[in-house]
Regions:
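N-terminal capping segment at the start of a domain
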Residues: 1-23, 29-31, 35, 48, ...
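A non-catalytic alpha/beta surface segment that caps or lines the substrate-entry region
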Residues: 13-63, 80-116
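Short glycine/serine- and small hydrophobic-enriched flexible loop segments
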Residues: 30, 161-168, 305-308
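Active-site-adjacent substrate-binding region
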Residues: 34, 45, 214-315
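A structural signal for isolated positions on well-ordered beta-strands in alpha/beta enzyme cores
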Residues: 40, 68, 176-178
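Solvent-exposed loop/turn segments at secondary-structure junctions
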Residues: 47, 73-76, 182-185, 210-214, ...
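Extended, hydrophilic extramembrane loops/domains of integral membrane proteins
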Residues: 66-81
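Acidic/histidine-rich catalytic neighborhood of metal-dependent amide-processing enzymes
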Residues: 113-230, 253, 260-261
Length: 315
C-alpha cells in the first residue's frame, strides 16, 4: 500500500469534525515540511456544519504559480443512499440525488401515518409528519460520519502528496498545492480562497477527486478551460495510458462533476471512472476497498509533466 495512504487510513480515516481535521492537518503540515515545502494554514469565518471554521492548507505562492493543483481533504456525512456520480450523464446523477429528499418524504409520511393510526390520533398525522421532516434537516450536522473515504477524497490528497514528493526543486516554485476544507459542504474552502486570493480566478486549477478506483482517468475541463488550448494540448501530450488504464480528455458534450472544480473559473477536474451498464461512466466511492496504485502512478507522472511543460503565457 502507498505510504501516504497507509498512514491516512490508519490514523485519519475520517476528517469531518474539527478535532479530526486538526489532527490530520498537523500531520499534513509536518509531512509537507519533511518533503521540503513551507505549507501555510489559511482560515476563514465560514462555519461548517460539523463544527469549526474553514481551514485550507496552501503550499506555494498562488500569485506566482503557473498552475494550481487542488483536492479537498475533508470527509462528509454518511449518505442514506450509496453515493453515485455519473460525470457524463448529469441527468442520471440528478435523478439519483432527487431520490434522497423523496425517500425522506416517504419515510416521514409512513412513520407519522403508522404511529397516529396505531394511537387512533389522525389529527396528529400532519404535525408529526412536519416534525419528522424538520428532524431530517439536522442530519447533515448530527448524522453518522462516512467511514469509507478511500476514494472520496483520500485518493486526491494522496495524489497531491505524490506529485509534491516527485517534483524536483527546479519546478516546485511553478506550482501551488491547495488542500481544501469544506469540499463536502458546497466547496466552502475553495470559495474562501478565491475571496482571499482573487488572482485564482485567472489561474488554471486542476482538481483531483475520486481518483482511487477505476479503469479510466477522466479529465473534464470546465467551460473556460475548454478554450484554453495550451492547457488542453499539454494534457494531451503529457498524460499517457498504460496497459490496463486509459486517460481520456473529454471536451465535448454535457458533463457535470459535483466538486470544487465549479468554484474555480479555470477549473478542470480529474476523476477515475468505471463503466457500468445503464449508467455509463460511474464512480461508486463507498465500494472502494483499496486505492489503485497504478492510478496514482499515472496521475503523478502526468501532473508532474504538466507542471514542467505548461506555459500559460502562450495562451
Amino acid at each position: 500500500m502507498n505510504e501516504f495512504a497507509e498512514r491516512i487510513e490508519r490514523d485519519f480515516p475520517v476528517r469531518r469534525k474539527e478535532k479530526e481535521k486538526v489532527d490530520f492537518r498537523t500531520w499534513l503540515v509536518y509531512t509537507l515540511k519533511e518533503l521540503g515545502y513551507s505549507p501555510k494554514l489559511e482560515s476563514g469565518t465560514s462555519a461548517l456544519s460539523a463544527g469549526g471554521n474553514v481551514t485550507n492548507v496552501v503550499v506555494g505562492d498562488i500569485e506566482k504559480a503557473k498552475i494550481v493543483l487542488a483536492a479537498h481533504y475533508d470527509t462528509g456525512v454518511r449518505e442514506v443512499l450509496p453515493p453515485l456520480i455519473c460525470p457524463t450523464r448529469p441527468a442520471t446523477y440528478m435523478l439519483y440525488e432527487a431520490l434522497i429528499p423523496l425517500l425522506a418524504l416517504a419515510v416521514s409520511f409512513l412513520i407519522s401515518f403508522g404511529v397516529t393510526f396505531a394511537l387512533n390520533m389522525p389529527n396528529m398525522t400532519l404535525p408529526l409528519f412536519l416534525l419528522l421532516l424538520v428532524v431530517t434537516l439536522f442530519y447533515p450536522k448530527y448524522g453518522k460520519s462516512e467511514t469509507n473515504n478511500k476514494n472520496a477524497n483520500t485518493s486526491g490528497v494522496i495524489a497531491l502528496l505524490e506529485v509534491a514528493k516527485a517534483l524536483t526543486p527546479r519546478y516546485r516554485g511553478e506550482v501551488c498545492f491547495l488542500f481544501l476544507d469544506g469540499g463536502t459542504q458546497g466547496s466552502k474552502g475553495a470559495s474562501r480562497l478565491i475571496h482571499a486570493h482573487p488572482e485564482l480566478k485567472k489561474k488554471s486549477v486542476v482538481v483531483l477527486d475520486c481518483v482511487g478506483e477505476g479503469d479510466e482517468l477522466l479529465i473534464l475541463p470546465g467551460k473556460a478551460s475548454r478554450w484554453n488550448d495550451k492547457l488542453l494540448d499539454t494534457i494531451l501530450e503529457q498524460f499517457s495510458n498504460s496497459e490496463r488504464k486509459t486517460c481520456f480528455l473529454k471536451t465535448d458534450g454535457l458533463v457535470h462533476y459535483p466538486s470544487d472544480n465549479h468554484a474555480f473559473m479555470g477549473g478542470t477536474v480529474i476523476c477515475a471512472c468505471k463503466k457500468v451498464k445503464g449508467f455509463g461512466r460511474c464512480i461508486l466511492p463507498r465500494k472502494t476497498e483499496e486505492i489503485d496504485e497504478e492510478n496514482l502512478s499515472l496521475l503523478c507522472d502526468g501532473l508532474c509533466k504538466l507542471v514542467m511543460y505548461y506555459n500559460p503565457q502562450n495562451t
